[in-house]
Regions:
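Extracytoplasmic/lumenal domain signature
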Residues: 23-27, 31-65, 75-81, 86-119, ...
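Boundary at the C-terminal end of the N-terminal hydrophobic targeting segment
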Residues: 18-20
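Intrinsically disordered, low-complexity serine/proline/glycine/threonine-rich regulatory regions
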Residues: 1-2, 483
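Bacterial N-terminal signal peptides
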Residues: 4-15
Length: 499
């Protein structure tokens, strides 16, 4: 396994200083993707402000197959919004004042997307120290500090592999959302589409440290080549920050995706510690890994790794939530019965008053039962116990026990005539858990945002954002002042009690 350390190209990097703290730093909030918020959310009383996240959304009939990057939040309540500006490429970040949405600054990027089906998310990150990184062309990271200051700046520029990077602007692509560790080191996947530096090979993982020094390792398997690091799979870090987790595609084709692997790497050296095939627990065949999804590893408080895959053969289109020990050497429990395009959120068991099991934490997942995929169309959300099990009614498999489930509320006109009781899909790829109110905030394709009260197992608040649309799944987050942020139909909505 090759590993490279290079002196990276840096523009104005040494002069940058980190002076702001971070409330929401990236995909699913933190490097473990827990999606837990310590900030109490405001009531879902009104849409306080809204802003487009796509200036040229490309619809497929009545559907929108575009993933949007998560907003980021500073402690000073600056909301940093990734925005798609063109039909197929073109990206910028806009910083807005959380109180009223007023524009503070705009930073553009020359980034272009890797080859894709559904449009991938554009994933920036804030370090815990408040430094902002976002992807640029040729594998470049663009950098700025003082993110709460109402001024556009000339960003710093960091390249992880070579000084003459502009030669490879068109071919070297950052292919995952960025992830920051507790010290401010940045991790991401890359791929090379065309001529590029030989050392990079065709796909791998890169790290840029706080001094701008780059490390990268091409990913390979002894049993065969790796096709690419999985698009949209934000790298995750163990609780002690020493192990990095990411998934990658093998070359065996399955439907619209491929077989895949989950890697554990030393976070400092990027040495591969272990790599395991991702298998369908029912058939024993390679599970499908799809670049149209955004599933990323979630790290439990005990170090377990949870990762969602699609089923093979495709019996349900729900997939599975696989679980692994921290070193990936074993599976400490049964899978969850849903894994497609979902990053599980961590729920402290104390938030669920009706729970009397032994687990210290539970998992919140989307739990759709797709009518178009052989299910009954009764789409739900679920709280699951990773240490207990029950028989899955559809597959006969033993799966994580359902602690709570809740059915969506809006009938689905596409399916309700053939599937009585069918409701619109839940439209989340990561849902924020509000620790202060014992609730989960989740989007639905009916265009509404729901507060799921875990004490009463009911929807205690609902607010309509749009008329509803079929779309690629989106995140929910909570800002520094408690406003809830949700994306629906290419628009970011800030919801709260009012200004």
């Amino acid at each position: 396994m090759l590993r490279w350390i290079v002196a990276v190209a840096v523009t104005s990097f040494a002069a940058l200083t980190a002076n702001a703290q971070t409330i929401w730093q990236g995909q699913a909030r933190d490097a473990q993707h827990t999606a837990m918020s310590a900030v109490r959310s405001q009531p879902l009383s009104t849409i306080v402000w809204q802003t487009p996240v796509d200036l040229q959304p490309q619809y497929d009939g009545n559907d929108l197959f575009i993933h949007y990057g998560t907003p980021l939040v500073t402690a000073a309540n600056t909301i940093i919004v990734p925005v798609k500006t063109g039909a197929n490429n073109g990206f910028e970040l806009k910083a807005r004042r959380g109180r009223d949405g007023a524009l503070l600054w705009k930073q553009t990027s020359d980034y272009t997307l890797p080859l894709h089906g559904w449009t991938p998310s554009y994933g920036a990150t804030l370090t815990p120290q408040g430094r902002l990184y976002w992807p640029g062309a040729g594998g470049t990271l663009l950098v700025r500090d003082n993110v709460d200051a109402p001024v556009t700046v000339v960003p710093g520029e960091v390249n992880f592999y070579v000084t003459a990077k502009r030669k490879f602007n068109r071919n070297v692509k950052i292919s995952t959302p960025l992830t920051s560790d507790a010290s401010g080191n940045i991790y991401f996947g890359y791929e090379v589409d065309g001529p590029g530096p030989k050392a990079l090979k065709h796909t791998g993982i890169a790290r840029v440290d706080t001094r701008g020094r780059g490390t990268f390792v091409p990913l390979e398997m002894s049993g065969g080549p790796i096709l690419r690091v999985t698009l949209n799979c934000a790298p995750a870090l163990s609780n002690n920050g020493r192990t990095l987790y990411v998934s990658a595609h093998g070359t065996a084709m399955i439907r619209n995706g491929t077989a895949g692997f989950l890697f554990a790497l030393d976070s400092r050296t990027l040495h591969v510690q272990n790599a395991v095939p991702l298998l369908d627990p029912q058939s024993g065949e390679p599970a499908e890994i799809s670049d149209d999804g955004t599933a990323s590893p979630t790290i439990g408080p005990d170090g377990r790794v949870f990762y969602g895959v699609l089923d093979n053969p495709p019996t349900t289109s729900r997939g599975w939530l696989l679980q692994f020990s921290a070193d990936l050497s074993q599976s400490p429990g049964v899978p969850g019965a849903f894994g497609w395009d979902d990053t599980a959120s961590i729920v402290p068991a104390s938030l669920v008053a009706s729970y009397h099991g032994s687990s210290a934490y539970l998992l919140m997942t989307k739990y759709n039962n797709y009518a178009g995929g052989g299910g009954d169309g009764k789409n739900r959300l679920a709280i699951l116990d990773p240490n207990d099990c029950q028989m899955d009614a559809r597959t006969g498999m033993m799966v994580m026990r359902e602690v709570l489930t809740i059915l969506g509320q809006t009938p689905d006109p596409q399916y309700e005539s053939d599937f009585p009781g069918a409701v619109r899909e839940w439209c989340i790829n990561t849902a924020v858990v509000d620790l202060a109110t014992n609730s989960v905030l989740a989007n639905s394709e009916d265009g509404k945002l729901y507060r799921w009260d875990l004490t009463s197992n009911s929807f205690s608040e609902i607010i309509t954002l749009t008329a509803g649309i079929g779309e690629a799944y989106t995140p929910t987050i909570i800002g520094a002042d408690g406003k809830v942020y949700a994306i629906n139909n290419a628009t970011l909505f800030a919801i709260g009690a009012g200004r």
